[in-house]
Amino acid sequence: MTQLSRFLYGGDYNPDQWPEETWSKDIHVFKKADINSATINIFSWALLEPREGKYNFSKLDKVVQQLSDANFDIVMGTATAAMPAWMFKKYPDIARVDYQDRRHVFGQRHNFCPNSSNYQRLAGELEKQLVERYKDNKHIVFWHINNEYGGNCYCENCQNAFKKWLKNKYKTVEGLNKAWNMNVWSHTIYDWDEIVVPNELGDVWGIKGSETIVAGLSIDYLRFQSESMQNLFKMEKKIIKKFDPETPVTTNFHGLPNKMVDYQKWAKGQDIISYDSYPTYDAPAYKAAFLYDLMRSLKHQPFMLMESAPSQVNWQPYSPLKRPGQMEATEFQAVAHGADTVQFFRLKQAVGGSEKFHSAVIAHSQRTVTRVFKELADLGKKLKNAGPTILGSKTKARFAIVFDWSNFWSYEYVDGITQDLNYVDSILDYYRQFYERNIPTDIIGVDDDFSNYDLVVAPVLYMVKHGLDKKINDYVENGGNFVTTYMSGMVNSSDNVYLGGYPGPLKEVTGIWVEESDAVVPGQKIKVLMNGKDYDTGLICNLIHPNDAKILATYASEFYAGTPAVTENQYGKGRAWYIGTRLEHQGLTQLFNHIIFETGVESLVCDSHKLEITKRVTEDGKELYFVLNMSNEERTLPSKFTGYEDILTGEKAHKDMKGWDVQVLRN
C-alpha cells in the first residue's frame, strides 16, 4: 500500500453546491470533529467545462486553496463520472444503450458508453487540464478516477468493439461456434458481422437480464464490458501518471459486491483499493465484514473506506437512523478488517436534488449540538489517538474462501434445476462459519496462490477454467485442505458442461461423482443425518457415488435416503470435502467443527461471547485486537483480554461491553 502519513478522516465535500462565503465556516466545523481530509470534484464536469474546450477552474482553485490552507488532505476527483448536457446534445453516441435497446438521454449518472471515442477524448482532455493544474499541490494525496464504475452498454460502439474482442479471443468463427455451442437452436454464425450483443430483443430476457439462451455469449459480454470500463480507468490513470507519477491513484469500488465489474482483475491497476460501504439496516454484520475482507484481499493490503454514511442512507427502501453508538461500531468494523481511512458521503447535506436526505457531518440543522455530530467528533478524537498505531497494520489469514466473478456471472445464468441460485448468499454461508469463530479469512480469486493457506473453501465453484483443477489437485496433494460443494466443477470457461459426471475435473480430488441433482422446492425440507443427529437442508441435493471418499453425512429422507450428502477424501498429503447440499446453518456449523479441527487452526478467542473479534499486526509485530459488539445487547469481554490497554482511550480494557461498544486492545 502507498503509505499514508496519517489516518484519513473525512469524506465527500461539494462546496460548489454552496455559496463561497460558507466554505470557511464548513471547514471550521469539520475541524471540530477532527476531520482532516476531503474528497472533492467528483461530479463537477459541467462547472469545469461549461462548453466544449472552454474550461473554468476558478471555483475549484478557491476550494483547493482553502482546504490546503487548513492543512486538509485532498482526494481529488477527476469529475468524469457525470457528463454535462452539451455533451449529450453534441455527441449522442456517448450515452449508453441499455439491454432493452434504449439509448439514455441527459440525466442521472453512470450513463456513458465506455467504447465511445468521443467520451474517451473529452474525458482525457479534461483530465489533462486538471492534472497539469494541480499536480504540484502536496495536499492532494490521492487522485480519484471517475466514480463507482458500472452500467453496461449495448450500443453500436460496443457491438463493434465486442466483435474485435471476440476475434482476438477465438481467432475464427469456427472457434467461437464451438466455444459457445452455437448449433443449439440454429445459432451457428458464419461471419463476425452476424454477432449480436446480448439484449432483451435477442438472447437475453427477464427484468434484469437474468436469463440467457447462449450463456457463453452473455458471460463473454460481461467480461468484455468489465474490460471496457477498466480501459477507461487505465486511460485516465496513464494521463495522471504522465504529469504526476508520485501521487497514488484509485477508483471507488462498491456494491455487494458490484456484479458488473471484475474487481480482482481491476485490482492490479489500483495503487490502493477503495470501497463505498452502505449496509442495509437489516443486513447481518458478517455480510459487511465479508465485503471488507474481500476489499483487503484484492491486494492483500489495507484499503480505503472511501464512502459510508454517518446515519441514514438516501436510496435504500427503508433507512432507519443508526442507533446511538452504531455509527462508530460500523466504521470500526471496516478498520478492523483492513481499512486505513474512514470517509463519509457526505460532509455537508445537500438542500436539493438526489440524495438530499442522505446523512452528513453538517446536517440540514447546521448545528453541532446534535447526537450524530457529537458521535462523529468522538470518533474523530479516537481515530486521532489510535490512527498512527493502526495505520499500515495488516491481517494474517490461514483460511481462504474463493470468490470469482466468472463464477458469479455463470452461476446466476444457470437455466434449470432451481431459480433460487444466488452466488453471494452461497459464499456467505461459508464465510459466516469463520466469522462466528473469529478466524481471520482472506477472500481470494482462482488465480491467487492457494499454498499460502491451511484451508481453501470454494463454494459453488460452478465454472472450472482450464488448469484450475490441476492447481487444486496439487494444493491438496501437497497437504492442503480443500472444501467444495454442490454446483461445482460443472462447466468450463465457456459454460459448456464437463462430461463423465459432476463435479467434472474435481472428481479425482473429491473422490466422488454426482449422478443427479434434486431441486428442493420452497417450503420443503430434506433431512441429513450427521453424527447421529438430523439437520435440515435445502436448495439442491446431489445424489453422490463415492469412489475413494468416506461418508460423513447421509440423506435421511426422500428416495435417496441413506446415500451420501457429505464426503471426505484423503488425496496425497491433504484432504478434500464435498458438501452435496445446502446445509442450514446448524448443520454446517457441526460439519465445520470437524473440518476446522482437522486443520489445526484455532480461533483468535474461544470464548468470544458473540463479539466480533479481529486482529491486525503492525510492522513491528504488535498485535491489535479489535473487539466489536455489533448488536444493541450488552456483551462480556473475553477473559483473555484482562489487563489489555484500549488504544482508543488509553485506559484498561473494560469487561462489560454495552450495545455497539468498541475496544481496540493491545497487551
From Swiss-Prot:
Activity sensitivity to pH: Hydrolyzes lactose at pH 6.5, 6.8 and 7.2.
InterPro entries referenced in this protein's UniProt entry, alphabetically: Beta_galactosidase_C, Beta_galactosidase_Trimer, Class_I_gatase-like, Glyco_hydro_42, Glyco_hydro_42_N, Glyco_hydro_b, Glycoside_hydrolase_SF
Catalytic function, reaction form: Hydrolysis of terminal non-reducing beta-D-galactose residues in beta-D-galactosides
Temperature dependence: Hydrolyzes lactose between 30-45 degrees Celsius.
GO molecular function (one): metal ion binding
Enzyme class: hydrolase
Assigned GO CC terms: beta-galactosidase complex
Family: Belongs to the glycosyl hydrolase 42 family.
Protein name in UniProt: Beta-galactosidase LacA
Protein's organism: Lactobacillus acidophilus
